[in-house]
């Protein structure tokens, strides 16, 4: 999960700031929660 957070912080935030002309990092939407669901039963 740390890899995803680092990627978002380092790459995605920069792209969003340039795409939407944000003046501050605090204006960029942040990821609050990621939920994964995987079924392992027989289909």
Curated annotation (Swiss-Prot):
A GO CC term assigned to this protein in UniProt: ribonucleoprotein complex
Function, in words: This is one of the proteins that bind and probably mediate the attachment of the 5S RNA into the large ribosomal subunit, where it forms part of the central protuberance. In the 70S ribosome it contacts protein S13 of the 30S subunit (bridge B1b), connecting the 2 subunits; this bridge is implicated in subunit movement. Contacts the P site tRNA; the 5S rRNA and some of its associated proteins might help stabilize positioning of ribosome-bound tRNAs.
Name of the protein in question: Large ribosomal subunit protein uL5
GO MF annotations in UniProt: rRNA binding; tRNA binding
Lineage summary: Bacteria, Pseudomonadati, Pseudomonadota, Gammaproteobacteria, Enterobacterales
Quaternary structure and interacting proteins, as annotated: Part of the 50S ribosomal subunit; part of the 5S rRNA/L5/L18/L25 subcomplex. Contacts the 5S rRNA and the P site tRNA. Forms a bridge to the 30S subunit in the 70S ribosome.
Keywords recorded for this protein, A-Z: Ribonucleoprotein, Ribosomal protein, RNA-binding, rRNA-binding, tRNA-binding
Entry's family note: Belongs to the universal ribosomal protein uL5 family.
Domain of life: Bacteria
């Amino acid at each position: 999960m740390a890899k995803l957070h680092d990627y978002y912080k380092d790459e995605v935030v920069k792209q969003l700031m340039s795409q939407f002309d944000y003046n501050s990092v605090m204006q960029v939407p942040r990821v609050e929660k990621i939920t994964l669901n995987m079924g392992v039963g027989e289909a």
